Structure formats: C-alpha cells, structure tokens
C-alpha cells in the first residue's frame, strides 16, 4: 500500500493522528478480509463486500492526505 510514498506515509504516521487512525483501521480491515478470503474468518458475502468497500474508502482518504502533504511540502 502506497509503496512509492513510504517516506510520506511514515512521516504522516508519526505526525498526523487522523492518518494514523485511518491506517490502523485499514490494516485491521485488510487482515479480516484476508482471513475471510482464506476461510479462517467466516463471513457472508454482503459483509465481506461491505468490508472491501470500507477498505477502499479508507485508502482513498489516506491518498488524499498524502496528496495534501505532498502539495504543502512542495
């Protein structure tokens, strides 16, 4: 996730509590989706799809914060 922006991600994780909250929640959802996909965590299809959509929304929000940080730093 955001491989080309790792330096900015690390900076935001240490300096921006909103970004950190989004990042942690994304990681938690990612783990649950992975477990559901491998059959370890039984979820119905609707719940799994909703989790995937929420995960994408979190990524979009983090991307906006990264873009804003990059723009302000330039």
Enumerate the predicted regions with their spans.
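Extended, charge-rich alpha-helical interface modules
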Residues: 1-74
């Amino acid at each position: 996730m955001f491989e080309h922006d790792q330096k900015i991600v690390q900076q935001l994780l240490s300096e921006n509590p909103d970004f950190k909250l989004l990042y942690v929640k994304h990681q938690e959802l990612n783990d649950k989706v992975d477990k559901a996909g491998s059959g370890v965590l039984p979820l119905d299809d609707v719940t799994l799809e909703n989790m995937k959509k929420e995960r994408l929304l979190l990524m979009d929000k983090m991307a906006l914060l990264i873009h804003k940080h990059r723009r302000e730093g330039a």
